[in-house]
Amino acid sequence: TFDIVFIDGLHLEDQVDRDIQNSLKFLNKNGTVVLHDCLPISEWHQRQVYGGGGIWAGTVWRSVAKLRMTDSSLEINVVDIDWGCGILRKKTKNTLFKKSIIDYSFYEENKNELMNVITAEQFKELYK
């Protein structure tokens, strides 16, 4: 089992979903999963196909958003640094984000609440 798992692989929702589920299977009780590229800054940066050249966050954000809407057994925060670093920990009875639509315009309008965005300073306090 692992204390920490870092996911920064193929930046597509389906693969990220699998990476998260596989990581959680082998995560220690108090372990943490960290995901990179959770906060794309534009619709172009979250496109499905990389195509080379420049930064690509892909659709990682969709995997995090789905978990925020459906899995109350996970504590989820996204630290607003380096394209968004998602922090997932096994907990109980967490509040779910109560929506089911997740397209980019919805993400853009609701990013902070949907992704449970925190600052680097808040991260330092929460995860001492």
Model region roles, listed by residue range:
Residues 1-6, 10-128:
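A short alpha-helical cap/connector motif
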